[in-house]
Regions:
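Gly/Ala-rich beta-loop-alpha elbow adjacent to hydrolase catalytic centers
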Residues: 126-130, 134
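Short, surface-exposed "cap/lid" segments of acyl-processing enzymes
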Residues: 38-77, 85
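Short beta-to-alpha linker loops that shape the active-site pocket of alpha/beta-hydrolase fold enzymes
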Residues: 75-86, 153, 260-261
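Catalytic nucleophile-loop/oxyanion-hole region of alpha/beta-hydrolase
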Residues: 80-119
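Short beta-strand immediately N-terminal to the catalytic nucleophile in serine-hydrolase-like folds
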Residues: 124-126, 150
């Protein structure tokens, strides 16, 4: 790996990776990028956020900046917003069709692959919505060596006030989505204002029915040290501070990068160095 030239993520522009296809327990295929290390005792599973992929955010820039450990960046089934899989036009996945109830299967497939590669200490690092899915895995796998939650999403209900500022419009959309699911049209799309642009009826119903406080409840099951990091320019700065105080134990760490935004532009190396220090303390 050379230090020059740099990519737009302030990392080396050329890094050797291997494309691998994983299989979830239910048979669905998952694409991932494997970044090898000379001695893969420690391996990090990178989980991206909504509308992202292995080519964006921490999943993209952290592996080249931490070459001493192995990395596996997985494309969640909700990667990007919409894409066709297989050869059938109707076989569509992506963020608009996100299935909140099965995302943990994507992570489990990645963890299993790391263990098959001989990785002894598996670390799960989730950014944004990936931090929600990482927390969802915590009650399901007590064998994870450490957790890294970067600007984590803590509820999937966040967009509601943006999509429907008028509560009555929100109620009408909720009723429509539930009716569509009852009619077997859960994969049909409902337009929304702003980004996502549209969401499937079934995915909207899942968001509506998400239990309050589920993220914090899940993080309470973590059986290994947790690093929770974010930038102090993010609007959820105060929320994350409060949540960290509620769950943190003696081995958990908080990282607040001054001036950093949601994607840590310009501070990629600072973030990587902080994660390396945390892992050195947490697992040696």
């Amino acid at each position: 790996m050379t230090e020059q030239p740099l990519s737009s993520w302030n990392t080396p522009a050329r890094v050797g990776v291997e494309l691998v296809e994983l299989r979830r327990d239910d048979g669905h295929p998952i694409d991932a990028l494997w970044y090898p290390a000379d001695e893969p005792r420690v391996g990090v599973l990178h989980v991206h956020g909504k509308g992202s992929s292995v080519l964006t955010g921490p999943s993209r820039f952290l592996p080249p900046l931490l070459p001493e450990i192995a990395h596996l960046a997985v494309n969640m089934r909700c990667h990007d917003l919409a894409y066709t899989v297989g050869t059938d036009d109707w076989a569509v996945d992506g963020g608009m069709w996100e299935d909140l109830s099965t995302g943990h299967l994507d992570l489990a497939a990645g963890v299993a692959h790391l263990r098959e590669r001989g990785v002894e200490q598996v670390v799960v690092s989730g950014h944004s919505s990936g931090g929600f899915y990482a927390a969802d895995l915590m009650p399901r796998d007590a064998g994870i060596a450490a957790w890294v939650l970067l600007s984590p999403l803590t509820t999937n209900k966040n967009p509601f006030p943006l999509w429907w500022p008028d509560p009555e419009d929100r109620d009408r959309a909720a009723a429509l989505a539930r009716a569509m699911v009852a009619e077997g049209r859960g994969r049909d799309l409902i337009p929304v204002s702003g980004w996502f642009h549209a969401i499937s009826a079934a995915s909207l119903v899942q968001r509506l029915e998400e239990p309050d406080g589920i993220w914090l409840d899940n993080v309470g099951h973590a059986a290994a040290p947790v690093l929770m990091g974010w930038g102090d320019t993010e609007p959820r700065h105060a929320l994350w501070n409060d949540l960290f105080r509620q769950f943190a134990g003696g081995s958990d760490r908080r990282l607040v990068l001054a001036g950093a935004d949601h994607y840590y532009r310009g501070q990629e190396r600072d973030l990587a160095a902080a994660i390396a220090g945390f892992l050195a303390d947490a697992i040696g």
